[in-house]
Amino acid sequence: MVTSCTGHVLDNQRATTRGVFSSGSHLVTLHFQPHPFFSCVTDAVNGARSRFSAFYPKANYGLQGSQPSDVRAHNRAANGACDEYKQLKVLSMGRQKAVIKARREAKRVLRRDSRSHKQREEESVTSLVQMGGVEAIGMARDSRDTSPILARNEAQLHYLKAIESKQLIFATGEAGCGKTWISAAKAAEALIHKDVDRIIVTRPVLQADEDLGFLPGDIAEKFAPYFRPVYDVLVRRLGASFMQYCLRPEIGKVEIAPFAYMRGRTFENAVVILDEAQNVTAAQMKMFLTRLGENVTVIVNGDITQCDLPRGVCSGLSDALERFEEDEMVGIVRFGKEDCVRSALCQRTLHAYS
């Protein structure tokens, strides 16, 4: 049974109660549902729809949209506001007048549901951000993996120690050893703890004779499939909504770009991850490593056995490993087949093809 109303909420513990409020052309819709689930959908700008959901009692905020353009349009809300209902574990976001009306309704719900919410009404609704929808989304970190990053074997332990103590780290070895996962997870940890200002992820687009020109869309959309392994880890560690906020060009806390875009840049106060480094040439590797500035950690991952460079072209990863072998300021970690942690089948496959 679903009960709908306008301007007030029906106290029905068995039904889903919905309150709808209109503020000019900007609509804020609150969906009230019996605990443990509560969600809020807001229509903020030009009909753009975003969903903020939570699972009580943990404050797991989720940001979704019917299309990416919906979320982007919502994020650009001018004169917007964001409220956090701590006890309901939900965010309400949109035009300021509409959010104020939603706030009143949330207070009413908290009063009626005193059995579950015993704190004072004033403590239940905290205004996070006014006149700035972008920052509000940045504050809305949804559920994310906060478990400690632990090593599953000795090689991973050396890798973690190298990332924590060195400015330049090379990691090479077979597939499934956790090179990409650990580097992305540590980068997310550094960003959350504000040890760095941004994360930069890059990789060469050369892979198995494929070309970005065959993929649809602009350069960002063409590059997206290549970024997916790192993206999945960052979303898991940062949270989906905070990740969307970080990817905004004007925010720039997380940047993804093809390797060719690194020329002429300087990396400072950042964690830089170069993935699939076996597919860069020696000259390209030199260009990349000379981009290093202050307070930067550069992690270079690759697998020499999966090199897609033309025959006779030396891999920049192999060349760099030889040049920095004796350098105490550089961390070098080599993973073997026995260090594969992806699955038993993956480990057997590595041995079968060795």
From Swiss-Prot:
Induction: By phosphate starvation. Pfam families: PhoH. Its main location: cytoplasm. SUPFAM superfamilies: P-loop containing nucleoside triphosphate hydrolases. InterPro entries: P-loop_NTPase, PhoH, PhoH2-like. Keywords: ATP-binding, Cytoplasm, Nucleotide-binding, Stress response. GO terms for molecular function: ATP binding. ATP binds at residues 173-180. The keyword ATP-binding applies. One of its GO terms (cellular component) is cytosol. It is found in: Cytoplasm. It comes from the Bacteria. Belongs to the PhoH family. PANTHER family: PROTEIN PHOH. NCBIfam families: PRK10536.1. This is Protein PhoH.
